[in-house]
Amino acid sequence: RPPMVSHSSTDNDPSTAGHSNQEGSSRIPNFFRMPIAERIGALHQRGLLSADDVQLLSSGNHQVQLNVADKMIENVVGVFGLPMGVALNFLINNRDYVVPLVVEEPSIVAGLSGAARLARLGGGFTVAPVDPILIGQVQIVIDSDPEQVKQTLLAHREDIVALANSLHPKMVARGGGALDIEVFDYQAEEDGRLMVVMHLLVDTRDAMGANLVNTMCEGVASYVEGLTGGKVFLRILSNLTDRAIARATVRIPVKNLEGKGYTGEEVRNGIVLANDLALADPYRAATHNKGIMNGVDALALATG
């Protein structure tokens, strides 16, 4: 798996963003004109790649071997390769990042690098800390009053949280673990069956957390059944991570948008108009979001 290569930058003055000899800098002019070996060397020279990274990238042997692939998934008949590039110029919270991207479509890497350079000239991106809260769902099918079931669960929230945390004491020792519960009730559309869903809110720290959350949900299921008199069915992580949303902001001086015969104000107004259409029209929104996903998908493939 290719690393997310980064290095702290001590020079936060945007006026120096074009200096290519700065150690750790992700600003490397003419990078796209270099031969591949020279690109790898430039990243290594700046401390953005380790010696092991250089050896691996220089070997040209990047494909998973067929016998290894056959042990990873079912019905293997081959392996599939895609180009891996790096987006340059990222300055995030005053730290330089070179971002690996795996993608087959041209212009995505260049476009992302160009946008990052524009952001860099204005001071770069600012990212707020994210609380790594994941949600585990415990589905309880009931015959009784859902409000009473919910109140029963809430009355025993401390016991439920303590039981969940007893299953992962090391996570609790690292400052994470189950924090709280939430309860909701629903009625099935077809047959009117009543169900209560309990959310277990879990701070997973630096762990991805899926197995941890699943184990906690499974571990409290019997106790929840005893409390409610219902029957627990699903007990599993939710992939809607709306409690762990990363937020980034960037400020770009209007004068930096000037180019190709347009003033900075004209470019700014055009961006705002395009965004207004995406907010109002689902057909533009789909295209708008596809452009965003070009970068998200490429980064996800590169970093696993």
Task: Give, region by region, the residue ranges found by the protein language model.
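Small-residue-rich
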Residues: A69-M72, G78-R193, V197-L201
